[in-house]
Amino acid sequence: SKYVASTPELDEIPAAAKLREDHCGGLDEQIGLCWGHSNQLNALEWHTCNEFNIAVRELVLLLAKREDLDEDDRLNADKVQAFYLAQGEMIEVYSDTLHFCPCEVTGSGFSCIVGLQRGTNLPIAPEQKVNKLWAANKWLLGHEANTGLIERGAFPGIYGENWKINPIIR
């Protein structure tokens, strides 16, 4: 899957200004896009701001609550719930909600418009990546089965089933 934090094409449309005014109190919100193929939990992240997702194609979000982290900041995957978003639906993901890359519903992939406080998810210097901070305003927990992400420095904070969404063949 791919993610672009901010795109001028989306940032400048009238709907983006309405989103900023209606849902962000006029704060500067970047409007980006996440798309591709994904069907497994693999990781969860959180931010200190709310996130808006608009399904361009139908998708499933795997979500949990930060309050479900144990005293070692680890999460049992049994706490994760799947939420379906139909094409065109918008959801506000609160800052205390663990989330990550959407999962595709069909084999044709997913596409999602993402609204976040400007600067969120931008790269940070390697020495800043401490205490699960992975990018600007992005804290990340990798599933312990996701060895590629763990080898790149993610905290192995999710254990149990690495949930998989099986796409529908249409």
Annotate each language-model stretch with its function.
Residues 1-87, 100-170:
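Active-site region of the double-stranded beta-helix
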Residues 93:
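Aromatic-residue-lined binding/catalytic grooves and analogous aromatic/hydrophobic interfacial grooves
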